[in-house]
Amino acid sequence: METPLEKALTTMVTTFHKYSGREGSKLTLSRKELKELIKKELCLGEMKESSIDDLMKSLDKNSDQEIDFKEYSVFLTMLCMAYNDFFLEDNK
């Protein structure tokens, strides 16, 4: 039986691959694919084009104009840290 944490990890991996490869490599997210993933999978509200550009620049460590799985994982880690901070503040 899959534990809640294992299910969460599976969801993170399958979500990446659900959007990757629609344009170009199956192993990376293009700017358009990243934008669609954020819009459909996260409740971050409507993001400005400049915000998407800034996010791409900050995540794209190898400057290839695509987000690979490692870069995507860093993004998820940053989100987890922000969620944790929110819950810590909410419990004060």
UniProtKB/Swiss-Prot annotation:
Binding site for Ca(2+) 1: 28, 33
CDD domains in UniProt: S-100
Cysteines joined through disulfide linkages: none
Transmembrane segments: none
GO molecular-function terms, A-Z: calcium ion binding; calcium-dependent protein binding; copper ion binding; protein homodimerization activity; zinc ion binding
EF-hand domain location: 12-47, 47-82
Binding positions for Ca(2+) 2 per the UniProt entry: 60, 62, 64, 66, 71
InterPro entries on file: EF-hand-dom_pair, EF_Hand_1_Ca_BS, EF_hand_dom, S-100_dom, S100/CaBP7/8-like_CS, S100_Ca-bd_sub
Key word Plastid present: no
One GO term describing the cellular component: neuronal cell body
Keyword line: Calcium, Copper, Metal-binding, Repeat, Zinc
Subunit structure: Homodimer.
Summary of the function given for this chain in its UniProt record: Binds calcium, zinc and copper. One subunit can simultaneously bind 2 calcium ions or 2 copper ions plus 1 zinc ion. Calcium and copper ions compete for the same binding sites.
Name used for this protein in its record: Protein S100-A5
Organism for this UniProt entry: Homo sapiens (Human)
Gene: S100A5
